Amino acid sequence: MSVTLKVEEREVRPRSLRKQLRHEGKALGVVYGYKVESTPISFDEKELVKVIRDHGENVLVALQIGGKKVNTLINKLDMDIFTPTIKHVEFIAVKMDEETEVETDIVLVGEAAGAKLGGFLSQTLFKVTVAATPDKLPERIEVDVTELAIGDSITVADLPEEKDFRVVTEGDIQVAAVVESTLEAELEEIEEAEAEAQATDADTATDDSEQTSEEQAEENKEDKE
């Protein structure tokens, strides 16, 4: 999968030029890497936002710059934390026949069988590192969890095997598990505690009753004497 993004070389200074570009709806960035010298660039911010929204950050981006095409990956994306705008992007030019490593999202698909019976599906790992040629990098890895019962879990080693890429993250790391609902477990503990308390009270009442009967019998015996 590859998308095309038209970019333009830009001057680093003056600062007012950068402000003007942003005012015009342009985002700023730089491209460097395989057979490419570090080059400051600008591009339509909305176009890249759409690319990321539709394909994720691991998509192969073919930059059209100065009449030539440069195959790149997004190496670093700096977003404004208050507004959904791009502050700066680093594109790294890549060699198409060499593997590269990136992080990709893990997406759980379906409703776990254990969740239908009152369990809770807990995801503990959200990304894994994968290795592939730039054009084979996955947008995400989907994992079917419909067969998971309460007490079952999935590790990295259980992720679907794909011929286009390989998972680099260690296989024994847990991805997700179906656990007993905390609320239900707490209710069970409360019920057990109440049952034990009732049993203790009953035993105490029996002991007290037996003791009272013995004392009464002893008093009656003394009266007769």
UniProtKB/Swiss-Prot annotation:
Q: Which InterPro entries match?
A: Rbsml_bL25/Gln-tRNA_synth_N (IPR020056), Ribosomal_bL25/Gln-tRNA_synth (IPR011035), Ribosomal_bL25_b-dom (IPR020057), Ribosomal_bL25_C (IPR037121), Ribosomal_bL25_long (IPR001021), Ribosomal_L25_dom (IPR029751), Ribosomal_uL5_bac-type (IPR020930)
Report the SUPFAM superfamilies cross-referenced here.
Ribosomal protein L25-like (SSF50715)
Segments of this protein annotated with the region Disordered: 188-225
Q: What is one process in the GO biological process aspect for this record?
A: translation
Spell out the GO cellular component terms annotated for this protein, sorted alphabetically and separated by semicolons: cytosolic large ribosomal subunit
Which intervals of the chain form a coiled coil? none
Q: Which UniProt keywords apply?
A: Ribonucleoprotein, Ribosomal protein, RNA-binding, rRNA-binding
Which top-level group of life is the source organism from? Bacteria
Is Ribonucleoprotein one of the keywords UniProt gives this record? yes
Q: Which GO terms describe its molecular function?
A: 5S rRNA binding; structural constituent of ribosome
How does this polypeptide assemble, per the annotation?
Answer: Part of the 50S ribosomal subunit; part of the 5S rRNA/L5/L18/L25 subcomplex. Contacts the 5S rRNA. Binds to the 5S rRNA independently of L5 and L18.
Q: Which family does it belong to?
A: Belongs to the bacterial ribosomal protein bL25 family. CTC subfamily.
Protein function: This is one of the proteins that binds to the 5S RNA in the ribosome where it forms part of the central protuberance.
Q: What name does UniProt use for this protein? A: Large ribosomal subunit protein bL25
Q: Which organism is it from?
A: Exiguobacterium sibiricum (strain DSM 17290 / CCUG 55495 / CIP 109462 / JCM 13490 / 255-15)
